[in-house]
UniProtKB/Swiss-Prot annotation:
It is found in: Cytoplasm. Pathway: Cell wall biogenesis; peptidoglycan biosynthesis. Keywords: ATP-binding, Cell shape, Cell wall biogenesis/degradation, Cytoplasm, Ligase, Magnesium, Manganese, Metal-binding, Nucleotide-binding, Peptidoglycan synthesis. Mg(2+) 1 binds at D302, E315. The gene is ddlA. GO terms for biological process: cell wall organization; peptidoglycan biosynthetic process; regulation of cell shape; response to X-ray. This is D-alanine--D-alanine ligase A. It is an enzyme of class 6 (ligase).
Amino acid sequence: MEKLRVGIVFGGKSAEHEVSLQSAKNIVDAIDKSRFDVVLLGIDKQGQWHVSDASNYLLNADDPAHIALRPSATSLAQVPGKHEHQLIDAQNGQPLPTVDVIFPIVHGTLGEDGSLQGMLRVANLPFVGSDVLASAACMDKDVTKRLLRDAGLNIAPFITLTRANRHNISFAEVESKLGLPLFVKPANQGSSVGVSKVTSEEQYAIAVDLAFEFDHKVIVEQGIKGREIECAVLGNDNPQASTCGEIVLTSDFYAYDTKYIDEDGAKVVVPAAIAPEINDKIRAIAVQAYQTLGCAGMARVDVFLTPENEVVINEINTLPGFTNISMYPKLWQASGLGYTDLITRLIELALERHAADNALKTTM
């Protein structure tokens, strides 16, 4: 059987650049090399695309705090549409190896917000994960919450700040509506980038300023007292949910360093120590949230489980991490689907959706 060429797109002009490098390394290591050849398409912090050497594409690969994309001499350009050579060398115009399917693992801005997905759609390339609309909606916490709320799903009460209205909403108003503690977040960031826990007016002002450094829109959320539970969802039209896992914190909240740098900042418990009926309840809610937002391929649904066993949806991540400590692959492994088979299934789902899209009529 002829191998498929999988283009792994990673890195990116994003605050989550280093997380993406870690994810890409694990996917490259785990992919079924009897079925797939890998083409590494690295995006540096300036947004320039490169074709990377699979044997030597990372610096400090085993150090999450200092991992970096090794510079490459080959810059990449992409030709939209159905072409034999979709990728060309940007410097000399010569064709580069073709790819059959793209596995995007660019976390954060321009990677999981629909931007990259739109480019791949225009290029007529199959790709792993959700389409443009679902990616954009899940990236924007304000939009996510509105859609989940309209579907009757439980979310934390919140207020949305913009640069236009931020000075018209006082801390007293926010505290009156949401109470304390509060969580202040950039609307369009992941991995807890720019997120602050707030218990005072002074902290609130600092937190809002920080969040606006990363986005034009900021979410202020009521702090929910509860356990942090995560569930992995996989599939297109008939998605399946994994067993649940729990993030047990040793720090104040699940910040960026806790997730990716400080190995002692949190403990990942899979499966979560919850009653079977609660596990099933969360799995059903995760699938409902996934379908409400129109997700495809994969997503991780994060919820809070209150002491009263109320499930409050926190967020939906359409390109979850594949780092050494990432929950998504661990949840499927605990559910009987190993890392290599998970990657294979994600590629299959991408090809299935692309075939279905191409079967749609484009003329009257």
